[in-house]
Amino acid sequence: MKNISDYRNKKVLVLGLAKSGVNAARLLHKLGALVTVNDKQQFDDNKDAQELLADGMRVITGRHPVELLDEHFELMVKNPGIPYSNPMVKRAEALHMPIITEPELAYQVSEAQWIGITGTNGKTTTTTLIGLMLNQQRPHHAFDAGNIGIPVSQVAQKVGKDDTIVAELSSFQLCGIKTLHPHIAVLTNIYEAHLDWHGNRANYVAAKMRITMNQTPDDYFIMNWDLPEMHELAKQSKAQIVPFSRKNAEGARAQLIDGWLTFDGDRIMKASEMQIPGLHNIENALAAIAAVKLEGVGDDAIREVLRTFSGVKHRIQYLETIDGRRVYNDSKATNVEAATVALNAFDQPIVWLAGGLDRGLPMDALTPLVKKHVKSMVVFGQTAPLMAKIAKDAGVPVQTTENVMTAVPLAYEVSRPGDVILLSPAAASWDQYPNFEVRGDDFIKAVNQLKATVESGDK
């Protein structure tokens, strides 16, 4: 880790905890900063706050008191989920206080080279593939971190200058970067998402494009050339554009050609040899291939990873086969586009579990997909009425239930051997769960309970 003296005795406010806030606070404390942590959750129920207090940091919980900013903090490290419309954040902006997110802090103290990955869908899988491929061959280590679940500030404290940080970066995180400069940036795709947080699509796209704002002509920006919008967005970057395409777009360096994954025209392997299903995963693989080829990784390492990698938890993750039904957990599908990808990934009849936070977005584009792929639906959460209407319009039976735990046995009852039982909510989890991981873990728990019941002969 760099020897950073800029933070010594600096008054820093960490706004919001969770994993990123906790690790940012610990890193700042280690660097000698005077850290105050403010989290909305009450202290008695806030294990993170209790541990930080025990470590010697000042902790204020239960609310976000705007008057706290009268103490003249020199920096705010904001939890990425807290919007800029929050009164504390707006007051900090009015005071011209620098506001950053945790990845920016990590970048400032890290000696490693960075590869940054963003996009509406496919970020985690692409990040994971890049890390696995780099570690398959190189003598130095690649560390996956960021929105993938491991805070970058945690990794930044142990990487060396010859290592690589492979960082999944959300639009929320990118809004708070200042100097973060990935040598290779990847933009997997852009669809409608998080418009409630960003206000409009233009702001969302601008947030995604911040991943390339500090790049130079010596850097690389990998983009999905199958999306016409990318061709215009590419003009905003100073980096060398490296396009990838599943549909033979002109100028793409990583392409699917006649069923083969290729780079600069050279065949690497047949896409059919990949362990993970779906056309979307071919796109993720092409993006990863482009990134690691720029780093000199050979075809053998790429083939080994793509032939063995079975998927990321909560992303069309295969769980079990129960009495002939294959069960998949796609809790990460927090929007219509991600659920569309999941529904298109299977040829078998699907019993679809869906529902979650209602962001007020149109969902009727799902109707023809339901008609084509789905035999029955089980819906829950705020969007349950919307999803039930989609089922009705598609002529598909539907049941409404409380949550994913109660949905699983209902899905089993209406399924038959040879079917797929798929959780792919098409909505965020925040109406019932703190995040999609907890929702997915509940689904896994319910599936395990169902399996035990079926195998005991009680079903």
From Swiss-Prot:
Database matches in NCBIfam families: murD
Protein name: UDP-N-acetylmuramoylalanine--D-glutamate ligase
Keywords in alphabetical order: ATP-binding, Cell cycle, Cell division, Cell shape, Cell wall biogenesis/degradation, Cytoplasm, Ligase, Nucleotide-binding, Peptidoglycan synthesis
EC number(s) given by UniProt: 6.3.2.9
Enzyme class: ligase
Highest taxon in the source lineage: Bacteria
GO molecular function, one term: UDP-N-acetylmuramoylalanine-D-glutamate ligase activity
Gene: murD
GO biological process, one term: regulation of cell shape
Catalyzed reactions: UDP-N-acetyl-alpha-D-muramoyl-L-alanine + D-glutamate + ATP = UDP-N-acetyl-alpha-D-muramoyl-L-alanyl-D-glutamate + ADP + phosphate + H(+)
